[in-house]
């Protein structure tokens, strides 16, 4: 796979049945796993050879990832979960973040502990967290699996608006229910 900081194809959908490797694929792209044959290239650099510090830099400024399992901290609030990422990058203002909470219908959950929120609400918080950093690509691993159609549309609009602002590519994985976007390439595993 070849990724670039100036993507010519900017919107991918990776579709497959459950258990067929979508999350594994994402783990390869973001450098969490290296047990693969072939190459993952970013701007012609083979990421298989990256050091830990190179991966940290890559994840901080080039690749954002919305995990299927979300990886939020249940004992802290929604805003605190988002701010952990935002403090690393200093990329978004609190006003922008609060606007996203409002647009996604969870403005009343800003100070709620994640562990007391529904999975769909947590999914929206995780998307906000994924957007508070600079990126050349964002990987959204089954991002709307627990959302109604309206919230899925809003989340897709927010993600695409931010990706366009940053001139970034988007890779969405799905088992069937996916954001209704104008995908430029669909890959079926």
Report residues per predicted region.
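Conserved ABC ATPase signature
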Residues: 113-123
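Hydrophobic anchor residue at the start of the ABC signature
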Residues: 127
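Catalytic Walker B motif of ABC-type/P-loop ATPase nucleotide-binding domains
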Residues: 138-141
């Amino acid at each position: 796979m070849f990724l670039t900081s100036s993507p010519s194809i900017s919107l991918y959908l990776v579709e497959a049945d459950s258990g067929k490797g979508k999350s594994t694929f994402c783990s390869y792209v973001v450098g969490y796993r290296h047990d693969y044959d072939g190459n993952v290239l970013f701007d012609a650099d083979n990421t298989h050879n990256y050091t830990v510090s190179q991966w940290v830099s890559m994840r901080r400024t080039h690749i954002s990832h919305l995990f299927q399992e979300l990886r939020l901290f249940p004992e802290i609030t929604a805003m605190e979960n988002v701010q952990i990422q935002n403090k690393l990058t200093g990329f978004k203002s609190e006003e922008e973040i609060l606007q996203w909470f409002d647009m996604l219908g969870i403005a009343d959950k800003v100070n709620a502990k994640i562990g007391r929120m529904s999975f769909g609400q947590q999914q929206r918080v995780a998307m906000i967290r994924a957007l508070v950093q600079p990126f050349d690509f964002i990987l959204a691993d089954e991002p709307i699996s627990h959302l109604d159609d309206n919230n899925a549309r809003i989340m897709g609009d927010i993600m695409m608006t931010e990706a366009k602002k940053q001139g970034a590519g988007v890779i969405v994985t799905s088992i069937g229910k996916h954001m209704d976007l104008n995908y430029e390439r669909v890959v079926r595993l």
